């Protein structure tokens, strides 16, 4: 396909238009008085959301050059979401603020490379100061506060705090749709390990790039599967029952993987293959743990078992399995309690007997997976539209809470970014252009507070000026339209979220400012289809 190219000023102006169109849509959702955005779906009811990354991913602009600018901002939001699970709207607002100021200076003749170096220096200074201002999360109440802020719901905050209390801060917490209208928590037997699907064509949810298997059979083997004939008799029995299948194997290669993928795409049956966790002897032990949890048998030559002779009775089962590109979570396995307890007792004995710290650590990890269970938050709502919106909020809150446990928390409502403004202003650039880049970041740090205030109907610059004069922990509570001590009031943000938002915004903004040419496809004018002739089907 033919390409069109724009250079320097033309290219940057088109990119900026795209940045503004996306950012102006997303930033209306920031803060407690933020508005919702309605997204049209290709099928089904429209989605109502205030989740920045969901809105950013949904936007496609007609102008190819503007669309490139929009997609780069969406990348900043998406990357922040991947790292911290929240802060996507803040990342978008910061990107727009840095790009707009930067473009003005580039048009006025500043060197974009020097500006970018200044932006990088300023970002490092801001992140260092953020970590100095950070508080550690220690109590259940603090966990509940972080989750409540992110989800805008005390009920959800309390549920997430309770879930973390029951399965531990590093425990597995999953989210499911409830059959009723209540949102509830349950703890079931389950396990998560760090292996994802072998092919992205196995996903069942393209938005989240996840595969969900309901009530699947689970084949557990330490062998490589390269010949589909080895498992064909078993597959035929599973197809007849209309059940799904999770394959946990040393590897699935050769003609076996494409054959499984093809059958999945055609809808013959739902199958996902993952590599077995661990290595060497530890792999065999972990497979035995999974077998105990799911009520299956490890198909291994060590036990004299062959793949081609596998019976359905040797397969494990679970109520649900969720597979992402990086992990597999088994929820509510069908293993007998006695078998699981036997494994637990064996591991505890091994922990007592081993003298190696490394072995002890690995054994403790296995023990935690077998005994910790999986906390399941069942999200309920009266309508499907409300359910989707509520589920987005629970996911955001869970991710934000994990981030706070990792790196601590800072004053919320954009206050933490205003508090690092002085540290950035104190940073000196080696050249005038570098200093310009530093000043751009210093100004951009106030953009989230301005936007939160404007969404609440206040004048942003007045709020920022007031915050500069008061105690660093005092911020603007937009929900109640007053200035309060944000830490005391529990209006807090995870440090990781704020840090990631700033770093990703600075990274994308630096790339946009140093762009000198943009190459885009020229859309083809497709002739309209001819009307159907009489008698044609």
Curated annotation (Swiss-Prot):
Species name: Lactobacillus delbrueckii subsp. bulgaricus (strain ATCC 11842 / DSM 20081 / BCRC 10696 / JCM 1002 / NBRC 13953 / NCIMB 11778 / NCTC 12712 / WDCM 00102 / Lb 14)
Higher taxonomy: Bacteria, Bacillati, Bacillota, Bacilli, Lactobacillales
Purpose: Together with its co-chaperonin GroES, plays an essential role in assisting protein folding. The GroEL-GroES system forms a nano-cage that allows encapsulation of the non-native substrate proteins and provides a physical environment optimized to promote and accelerate protein folding.
Protein name (database record): Chaperonin GroEL
Keywords: ATP-binding, Chaperone, Cytoplasm, Isomerase, Nucleotide-binding
Record InterPro entries: Chaperonin_Cpn60_CS (IPR018370), Cpn60/GroEL (IPR001844), Cpn60/GroEL/TCP-1 (IPR002423), GroEL-like_apical_dom_sf (IPR027409), GROEL-like_equatorial_sf (IPR027413), TCP-1-like_intermed_sf (IPR027410)
Record's catalysed reaction(s): ATP + H2O + a folded polypeptide = ADP + phosphate + an unfolded polypeptide
Top class in the EC scheme: isomerase
E.C. number: 5.6.1.7
Stored HAMAP family: CH60 (MF_00600)
